[in-house]
Amino acid sequence: SDAEDAEELSDIAALKILKEVEGNIIIRKSYVGQDLTGLDNITSIGGLQIGTETAFATNSKLQMVSMRSLQHITGDIVVCNNQVAYVQFDNLETIDGNIIFRTSSLQSFEFPKLTTVVKDFDLQCLTSDGEPGGEITSLRIPELTKVNGRLGVNNLGKMISLEFPKLQEVGSVDFASIPIPLETLSLPELSVVNGDLNLVSSYIASDAFTSTGNNKLQEIDGLSNLSIVKGTLTISKFQVLKKLPDWSKLEQLGGLTLLRLLECSDRILDLSKVNFVPFEDNEPLISITDGTIFSKIITKEDMSQVSMFLAPSGITGSSVGIDPELNFKSIKNFKYSSNMTTDPVFQFERVYGNMEIIRGSKKGVSAPNLVSVD
């Protein structure tokens, strides 16, 4: 019970006779045990709930959440308790609902046989002060192949390695606060993303002139099997990322955002096989900004349904960069912002929407083949 005067319960060993539970197992705050040992013989449940996202559980002694024999959950796992440090489900293979964990004390997170999550997979370690938390340094879900919903892993402040070696298809990927010390990010088999794919570093802006994003990740292991990202593919704020993944198999994007990839040595961005397709209510946009520099951006010649925003020297007035060579002949909307001393030359012929060029004083731009701006 959650009542203030409820009798405390510290031992659930008597429940070891249970093999299946059709409904939900709900752990109330009157339970003061350190683990769930009495549930270790259960193979199937409707769901497991310890707290909610809006009302965290206050079981002050519960440190380990494990059900060692559990193979199948027909509903959700929801664990929202900042005391939980260890998570272990040795035999769990499928979750027909969501898996949601919120704990700022996480030290280990083990799902060695999990293959399928029908809805969302969402792990966060945000502290009560709103800062990234947890002591866990490595997260690897070795057999996971499909997440129908959102895959989110965020605010794990000490994470060094994040690996999903067999993941092939996902509803969306939301890694929106990748830790600054992360060194390994591995998604080698990922092929289909039915929404957005966000790889965004945590970011600390000290003042107007200095800032810190992830300063360890030099290469993303994988994404070379990507064929479809129906939403926007975003890679952002990785200070020492040396190269982009090989996207030679990529056929469809809803949009592309590359932001503040300051040391990326790739100079040619080849998107020649990519069809940009509207996703939900969003029209396709290619946005390459804040010091992310390419000498050539190769696309299909007809980009009349796509907008593009380029700002290759967008860092605090920098004049260092390269004006990219563009091969398309038509574009929907085109915006270019640069402080570089050279005057760019654009060879495209038609802009079907708006064209905006932002340059410093006494700086120009040339578009000798431009026929019309509608």
Give each language-model segment a name:
Residues S10-I17, Q34-D40, V65-S69, V87-N91, ...:
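Recurring C-terminal helix/loop segment of individual leucine-rich repeat
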